């Protein structure tokens, strides 16, 4: 089983890493991050802080674009090409296919995120000569990478039962909602309606809370996210992402390709 998952992961990595659109997005992202060096000179304030803020935001935005674009095509592309029949005709179970595809794309996103983080590190180093801020760039980028893995899992889930366009819409919607989930508890606490309070609590636990991976502010202000926060983010990814992948595998097992 593990060998088959690893084989599918390796093939997925090779396919995604050769994607010309991926290179176009990555090249544009690296260019924007590199230009933060010049944008900072046009701004008033702490130049190193501005570079870190714009740079990490660029990694985040372009990472999400790559995760959503590649994630929604993981399953639908194989179905459209009819290669899914060839793959499943071999001794490959459907859940192995989903896990292998997701893990392979996660490796690709890891390499692209690392590349963008290194460029930002070098640009930022021009203003701050080493220290906590530079280390924090990689930690914040790790948080972004965890978020991208979760978004990939969600995109894979949606692609098992709907079209690529709808998968992209649903995934981007959850990306936006995932960064305001914390406000649901605030709305519920302030409401006088018991139904609204219960509903807000249910939605709070059902919807993804992507703020668990948001460690950018610590870096912008010259610090590093505390260790318990990092551990909680990783635990949340494993638990929530694992549940999403299990649901994806369950839906894909029941999918009819005829």
Which residues does each PLM region occupy?
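Aromatic- and glycine-rich beta-strand/loop motifs that create alpha-glucan
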Residues: 1-23
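Hydrophobic/aromatic residues in alpha-helical transmembrane segments
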Residues: 64-71, 84, 119, 154, ...
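Helix-capping/transition residues at the boundaries of transmembrane alpha-helices
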Residues: 15, 76, 87-89, 155, ...
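Short cytosolic juxtamembrane segments of multi-pass membrane proteins
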Residues: 254-258
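Helix-loop-helix units of permease transmembrane domains in multi-pass membrane transporters
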Residues: 9, 74-106, 252
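Secretory targeting signals
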Residues: 30-74, 98-166, 182, 187, ...
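Hydrophobic core positions of alpha-helical segments in small-molecule transporters
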Residues: 24, 28, 99-100, 170-173
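Terminal transmembrane helical anchor/hairpin motif
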Residues: 2, 35, 42-45, 49, ...
């Amino acid at each position: 089983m593990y060998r088959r998952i690893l084989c599918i992961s390796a093939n997925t990595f090779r396919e995604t890493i050769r994607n010309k659109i991926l290179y176009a997005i990555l090249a544009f992202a690296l260019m924007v991050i590199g230009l933060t060096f010049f944008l900072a000179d046009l701004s008033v304030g702490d130049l190193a802080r501005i570079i870190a803020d714009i740079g990490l935001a660029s990694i985040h935005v372009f990472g999400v674009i790559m995760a959503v674009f590649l994630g929604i095509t993981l399953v639908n592309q194989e179905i459209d090409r009819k290669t899914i029949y060839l793959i499943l005709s071999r001794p490959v179970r459907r859940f192995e296919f989903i896990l292998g595809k997701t893990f392979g794309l996660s490796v690709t996103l890891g390499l692209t995120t690392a590349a963008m983080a290194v460029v930002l590190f070098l640009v930022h180093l021009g203003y701050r000569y080493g220290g906590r801020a530079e280390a924090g760039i990689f930690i914040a980028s790790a948080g972004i990478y965890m978020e991208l893995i979760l978004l990939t899992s969600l995109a894979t889930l949606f692609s098992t039962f709907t079209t690529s366009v709808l998968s992209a819409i649903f995934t981007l919607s959850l990306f936006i909602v995932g960064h305001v989930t914390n406000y649901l508890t605030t709305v519920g606490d302030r409401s006088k309606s018991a139904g609204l309070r219960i509903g807000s609590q249910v939605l709070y636990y059902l919807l993804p809370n992507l703020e668990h991976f948001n460690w950018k502010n610590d870096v912008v202000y010259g610090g590093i996210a505390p260790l318990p926060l990092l551990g909680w983010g990783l635990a949340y990814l494993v638990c929530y992402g694992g549940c999403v992948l299990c649901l994806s595998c369950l839906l894909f097992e029941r999918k009819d390709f005829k």
